[in-house]
Amino acid sequence: MTSLLLAGWSVTAEAAPAQDALLPAAVIFATSTGYWEDDGNAPNVERAPTGAESVANPEEEGTQRHGYYKLFAVRQPDRTSKVYLQQIAQTETGPAIASTIELQEFSDLKPYVTDIRPENSNGIIKQPGLFATVYLKTDPAAEPDGWTVLIDEFGDITVEKATN
């Protein structure tokens, strides 16, 4: 237990037990950004694996869905990272994962991810799409390079080395 005294207020914080962790320790960087919407009949983001969790309800076809994207890096045992993209649906009961995909372009590089940043930090974006930058090294001694992840209004994903 940790105690902290702030301007006459005593605050006590207790560490949560390891088994109650909300975010796995291997997730080293994450950002939630962008916006998507569909009529409920559209497929989830391109390249989604067959085992992706889906929030589409076949009995309620045509139900409008919308949400945002989450881009995150997961450290691997060899200290490199895999980068994943999630499509998060805003539902009546709160956020729900619509799909999760591994961005193979990053996995092929076996990168050391040093940061992930959204295009801006202004909060909710109402134009469909996503733009974020993943900073990575392919050699641990090198300087990081920026790689952009772009999702257009049609849901097509582009991953490419950033240009200055």
Regions found by a protein language model. Name each.
Residues M1-G8:
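Bacterial N-terminal signal peptides
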Residues G8-W9, N164:
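Intrinsically disordered, low-complexity linkers and terminal tails enriched in Pro/Gly
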Residues A15-N164:
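Exposed acidic/polar residues on beta-strands and adjacent loops within beta-sheet cores, strongest
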